[in-house]
Amino acid sequence: MKGRIITDKGSMVVEFFDKDAPKTVQNFIGLAKQGFYNGLKFHRVIRGFVAQGGCPNGTGAGGPGYSIDCEVLGENQYHEKGVLSMAHAGKNTGGSQFFLVHDRAQTQHLDKKHTCFGKVTEGLDLVQQIE
């Protein structure tokens, strides 16, 4: 399954890991279809690490009003460049916030702790341009 993330820098095509993280993919797509992400900013950008978005109030403290369980046991649970992963404040506390990985070198410690649920397959250069 594929989707598109549209930013002010351009658009990216994402291939979702629906076998690894079916509930996370379903949650993300459901929020997107409801327009939840429309107009939201990437509120946390750390060069060489991640660009994080999905907070409705832009501070990193907001969410959809519920939490989903982590899904970290699949084959694609490695934070390499272009991976789309759930942000959370602890196990099973994610909801709407996600991040795009800039570089594998700085994100290995996130493997099997944050749910990887997709990867940018087109427009990968845009990940580095998000500010």
Give residue spans per PLM region.
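Cyclophilin-like peptidyl-prolyl cis-trans isomerases
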Residues: 1-131
